[in-house]
UniProtKB/Swiss-Prot annotation:
Function, as annotated: Regulatory subunit of the poly(A)-nuclease (PAN) deadenylation complex, one of two cytoplasmic mRNA deadenylases involved in mRNA turnover. PAN specifically shortens poly(A) tails of RNA and the activity is stimulated by poly(A)-binding protein PAB1. PAN deadenylation is followed by rapid degradation of the shortened mRNA tails by the CCR4-NOT complex. Deadenylated mRNAs are then degraded by two alternative mechanisms, namely exosome-mediated 3'-5' exonucleolytic degradation, or deadenylation-dependent mRNA decaping and subsequent 5'-3' exonucleolytic degradation by XRN1.
Protein name per the record: PAN2-PAN3 deadenylation complex subunit PAN3
SUPFAM superfamilies in UniProt: Protein kinase-like (PK-like)
Domain of life of the native organism: Eukaryota
GO molecular function, one term: zinc ion binding
BP terms from Gene Ontology: mRNA processing; nuclear-transcribed mRNA poly(A) tail shortening; postreplication repair
Region annotation Pseudokinase domain: where it falls in the sequence: 323-585
Domain remark in the UniProt entry: The N-terminal zinc finger binds to poly(A) RNA.
Length: 717
């Protein structure tokens, strides 16, 4: 066509408006049809747009609107209702009005052939013709209607069918996150038809029913819009014709039965970032009745790694070592050579906090600036020491004690970092260690007490007392369940030993007969007997101070408790005498055998982890040289190159495919066998095949090892 016919073009929509939303040649005489030809410029009072009557029997598909122009909650009820006449073609009321597309009024344009984001189109059953006076589109009898089924996991609000049926209502962008939705937003609606407002006036009961819905269902922007969609569709249940059966059920089930999250932007199925390690993510050991009998040469994966119970215990200790708690007070950031104070006063009773000459004390986990290790700091409040040699002498005496059953002293100093003159005593830190009082009387579940455990406690405490008593000028003072800590299964240590000596030197006026060293040592044995008696009473579940009530305890242990707790020892007694007379070497050997067995077990586990560490270093070396970006264009890593063998070997170890099923092979035994042979450099030959099975190579593990070492050294030079 050389020249466009204006009479023909005036009924054709301008393509510029459809694509760009406006036509820049409109003022220059564009002959095509523009939607805003007859619409006046918008002012403060919106005007009614021109409408044209809908032809009879033509389906009017609503224009999809943007998120910003979606109607608010309860903004428009659904009023489409089928009639009993199946062949009705149109309603008998006023003519339905079809809006013209206004690019300026529409925030965005969405093709009608594609569903909105986060929705799925499903075909509903055939609807009959609508009731007269309905503001919805004119539907021909037997015409399938496409409803938008919302995706409850989408963060984009989805328009409801009721809102799609009334495209002539232009909504301003509303605050989707505000809970104050309701009739107030209806006052901001721009009515371009007039019939819609009349419909609200004719059906006040529907408006009041919709506006009475709860508006505080959630805080996210998608929840109120989804409630609006559910309620708009639920209005179809008031009609008298056939209903779309699956739509309402799926909508209600999506928000109620499936548990719609309150804020769809953050999925609720993921654990929070601060959650601790979940041990169930590891494959647990099967129950004993389900274990398969293995041959002598067979192994299971759990036999190649650290046992689950030991792994969990070690992981918990590491977690406790690095765990931080809020201080809850004005703690200093640095105390002498230590920083990062973490309070550890969990179960300290008032009698325990004031036990050092009526001075309060506090426990902290600290990090050393000297060696970076974690230590335990005990602070004794408000201690005045005029002679600094008292601290140095006490530290020199206690630093000589080296026993597996005594917590080692690491540092001793005075500090004013807490706002007063405090005494700081630093010991070795044992993560997850608890006192005997906490382990057997406070924590749940409590540690079970047995007679073998009591004998083990007695031998270990006597071993620690032997080391303390053999050091001249060292006394531990009172011994109770709070001073003895449980560091592992059946392993205990005597803690808080240096506090007694230094506080006696600082406050000599409070000493009565504490200067008698023999009485102090005998008092330690009496305290040991009282500890054993408390634990034995808990085991037998009996009360009172009569040893005869301990029915589940052997006579030998009863005799030991009676001799120690009720001061039936002679004045000059030592550890060797107690062991020889009341315990016996058979008990000592039994405890020593248990400790030896556990040491061998721990070394065996460590040896397996040592092999795993060797293989891990080998895997790291392979990954350092394999798959690097700069090697993609290197001819040495291509099929003709000499380093292509490393690529084939890597695929041979980790990327094998089962020829029968076509699935990847995850054989841990195959990986360990290949890596061990590679690390040893055996002469065994292997057949390496390319993925397309066109090229093969026969090479030994020794050659592959030499090639890997050569490539790694060349890369690190």
């Amino acid at each position: 066509m050389d020249k466009i016919n204006p009479d023909w073009a005036r009924d054709v929509p301008c393509r510029n408006v459809i694509i760009y939303g406006f036509c820049k040649k409109k003022t220059e005489g564009c002959p095509f049809k523009h939607d805003d030809d007859d619409i006046a410029t918008p002012t403060s009072t919106p005007k009614v747009a021109d409408t044209v009557p809908a032809p009879s029997g033509v389906i009017q598909q609503p224009s999809k609107i943007s998120v910003s122009s979606l109607p608010s909650l309860n903004s428009q009820p659904s009023s489409t209702a089928p009639t009993s006449a199946p062949n009705a073609t149109a309603h008998t009321g006023s003519k339905s009005q079809v809006p013209k597309f206004n690019a300026k009024a529409s925030a965005s344009f969405t093709p009608m052939s594609k569903a909105a984001d986060g929705t799925q189109e499903t075909q509903a059953p055939y609807l009959e013709s609508p009731v007269a006076g309905s503001p919805g589109p004119i539907l021909k009898a037997g015409t399938p209607v496409s409803f938008m089924q919302p995706n409850i996991y989408s963060t984009t609000p989805v328009p409801s069918p009721a809102s799609m049926a009334m495209p002539n209502v232009v909504m301003p962008p509303n605050d989707m996150g505000s809970p104050d939705l309701g009739l107030q937003q209806q006052s901001h609606m721009v009515n371009l038809d007039g019939s819609i407002q009349q419909n609200y006036q004719e059906r006040p009961n529907v408006l009041m029913r919709d506006s009475s819905m709860p508006l505080t269902m959630g805080t996210s922007g998608s929840r109120p819009m989804l409630d609006q969609q559910i309620h708009s569709i639920s209005g179809l249940s008031n009609t008298s014709g056939p209903q779309p059966p699956g739509l309402l059920q799926s909508m209600n089930g999506a928000s109620m039965d499936m548990g719609l999250p309150m804020n769809l932007r953050y999925p609720t199925i993921y654990p929070p970032t601060h959650s601790i390690l979940q041990y169930h993510l590891y494959a647990p050991d099967p129950p004993p009745q389900l274990e398969i009998a293995l041959k002598e040469n067979e192994r299971t994966p759990r036999m190649l790694f650290i046992p689950n119970d030991l792994r969990e215990e070690l992981v918990k200790r590491n977690l406790a070592s690095l765990q931080l708690f809020p201080s809850g007070g004005n703690l200093p950031h640095i105390v002498k050579d230590y920083f990062g104070l973490v309070p550890l006063d969990f179960h300290q009773r008032s009698s325990v906090k004031d036990r050092y000459k009526k001075h309060k004390n506090s426990l902290y986990k600290v990090f050393s600036n000297v060696d970076g290790r974690i230590y335990l700091l005990r602070r004794i409040h408000d201690v005045n020491i005029s002679d600094p040699t008292i601290i140095s002498k006490t530290f020199q005496k206690w630093s000589k004690i080296d026993s597996s059953n005594v917590v080692a002293l690491k540092d001793l100093f005075l500090t004013t970092a807490f706002g007063d003159s405090s005494l700081g005593i630093v010991y070795d830190y044992y993560p997850n260690a608890t006192s005997l009082y906490e382990a057997h009387f406070v924590n749940y579940p409590t540690v079970e007490v047995t007679e073998d455990l009591l004998w083990s406690y007695a031998v270990q405490i006597l071993n620690g007392l032997r080391e303390i008593h053999n050091t001249n000028g060292v006394n531990i003072g009172d011994l109770d369940c709070d001073k003895i800590i449980l560091t592992g299964k059946g392993r205990i240590k005597i803690s808080a030993g240096a506090e007694y000596d230094i506080m006696n030197m600082c406050c000599p006026e409070d000493n009565e007969d504490d200067d008698n060293e023999e009485k102090l040592r005998k008092r330690n044995f009496v305290d040991l007997g009282e500890i054993l008696f408390k634990l034995a009473s808990k085991m037998c579940n009996c009360h009172g101070k009569d040893v005869a009530n301990l029915a589940q305890v052997s006579e030998k242990l009863k005799n030991l408790i009676k001799s120690l707790a009720f001061e039936q020892l002679h004045d000059y007694v030592n550890v060797a005498t107690i062991i020889e007379k009341y315990i016996g070497l058979d008990v000592v050997f039994k405890v020593m055998e248990a400790q030896q067995t556990y040491s061998e077990y721990a070394e065996n586990v460590l040896s397996r982890e040592l092999e795993n560490g060797r293989l891990f270093r080998l895997i790291c070396k392979l990954n350092f040289i394999f798959g690097r970006v700069e090697n993609r264009l290197d001819i040495n890593w291509s099929e003709p190159g000499d380093k292509f063998v490393i690529v084939l070997f890597y695929d041979y170890v980790f990327h094998q495919i089962d020829p029968n099923t076509g699935k990847p092979v995850t054989d841990l035994t195959h990986v360990l066998r290949c890596l061990n042979k590679l690390d040893a450099g055996v002469e065994e030959n292997i057949l390496l095949v390319t993925p397309d099975e066109l090229n093969t190579a026969v090479v030994s593990y020794k050659k592959v090892k030499e090639l890997v070492d050569k490539t790694f050294r060349a890369m690190t030079l």
